[in-house]
Amino acid sequence: MVLTSCETESMEFKEAQVYRSDVVGSLLRPAYLKDARDRHEAGQLSEAEFKRIEDRAVDEAIALQERTGIDVITDGEERRYAFYGHLIDAVEGFDKFGGWAIPFRNEKGEELVLPRPVVVSKLRRKRPMCAEEFTYVRARTHHPAKTTMISAQQAAAYYDSKKSAGAYPKIDAYLADIVDILRDEVQELTRLGCTYIQIDSPQYAALLDPQLREGYRQRGNDPDRLLDLSTEMDNAVIGDCPGITFGLHLCRGNNQSKFYASGDYGPITRVFRQTRFQRFLLEYDDERSGGFDPLRQVPEDRTVVLGLVSSKKAALESKAELKQRIEQASAIIPLDRLALSPQCGFASTIEGNLLTLADQEAKLRLVAETAREVWGEPVIATRVPA
């Protein structure tokens, strides 16, 4: 497959529906679901019983988002072991825990290492990655629903020039297969009626961090070339789908309330200009993300979702603080092109961040209530569940 860049400056990419309160994707996994996953993986729980327990967790995630008033909801990624789990579970060819182990840290300097996947054989899509997630949510709620997917750029981190060489001597062939798989998934979701697809790409921010840039080089991947290639891959994946809102989520790592990168968006603002996404969901909960000035590079027909509410810390932000920061951002991006969300998911990995279920609910309610006070009641078409 040949990847070509897209000149987006002269084209309009307005989103089909404006959502003022959003959720990035993952929600905390209840203890009973974690236990069930352990028993299922140990062969102590049947597939049918595990599916029943997963369904219960998704039903609870849907109910949580509905009662807190979030405009558009997800299944909480309850069926995934990590935000990228849908790729690893649905596509053959990965060693689940044999890849580049990136250290996550917090403000105290405490670290943990997350073993990640690595491609070791030719990729083969065994089943759709997100179709079940979307169709289940659509059947259970009258609210607008979205689906979250890994980006090709994130999957680039699962290539190792030594461990992957037997299947893919060069990274380009691997990434071409990844793009084809992800593009097929987008087409399937579109066919099923999904109107909002979010692409998760925290590895863009990894390209800001000197240590992580060196990690890419050591694995045969030029980080500077990867930035331009990644925007091309993103455009190839989402293609041209009128009536579909595509969002891009950028953060700096999210694992058990720890992160792996810092730095403002300045060095990667070409992502705003060169991709087709109508909606950018950006982490902005603390000083690690820098200021709002890079938002000047966002084209005038795009929406910026300000991730001002921390999903890493239990302390609840004040509405006054959020409104002040929204006002600051509106000096750069007009208010009618802004929205509000948590800075990331609450459980990008199954362990989840260091918050309680009550903390999570309070944060989601804060997002929804603040959005309504700033932008008014949403004008969103609801539907009867299928």
Write out the residue ranges for each language-model feature.
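Domain-level signal for soluble alpha/beta catalytic cores
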Residues: L3-A386
